Amino acid sequence: NILDASGELIYSQDLGLKGWGWQVNLNNKITYFDRQSKGWFVMDSLKNIVDSVYCKNEYIADLHDFLALENGNYVLFSYDEQEYATDTISPNGSQDETVIGLVIQELDSSHNVIFEWKSWDHFYMSDYPDINYNNNTIDFLHCNAIDIDEDGHFLISNRTISEITKIHRTTGEIIWRFGGAQSDFTFSNDYPFSQQHCIKGLG
C-alpha cells in the first residue's frame, strides 16, 4: 500500500510472496524483492516494472536490502554457504560444517559485475569467540542492511557478530569495524550495541 501525505490510500496491490522489502530507493524508484524468482524489481512512478535485478556468478540475491543508485548501478548481496573445518577453531566444531558467509555485488546499468566482495577474504571465524558451534549451520555473517557512506564506501550491518563494517568500494579492504569482538572503537559510558538490524549513513 502507498499512502499520500494525508494518509489517503493512493495505490494498493497484493503480490503475495513477491511483495517484500518495498521502498522508494536512492534513484527515487520503487523497488521490491520477489521471493519466488529471488530477484529485485524496479518500478517507475506509474508502477510499471522497468527492470529486474539478480545476483551474478551463480549467487542468489538475498531479500534483506538492495540499493538502486542514481547513476543506474545496483548493489545487492548474497549469503554464501561453504563447508568449513571448524574443529580447528573450537572443540565444539566439526570437520565439515556449513558456514554462511557474505558476497556483495555492484552491477552497472547493464547488469555487469563491476565490484564483487567476499567475506571469506576478510573475516576469520577465529576472531569471534562467541560463535555458537553447536548449530548444524553456522550463520557467521548475517548481513541485514547495506548503505553507502558520504565518502562513497559501503557500510554493512552483520547482526550475528554485532558489527557494523565499512568496506572500501574499490579495493574491498575493511576501513573500520564498529562493535563486536574486533571493534576499532570503544564505548565510553555506554553499553555496546548487539544484534542490530539496520545501518544508515547519516553524513
What are the language-model segments listed below?
Residues 1-203:
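Histidine-/acidic-rich catalytic cores in large beta-rich domains
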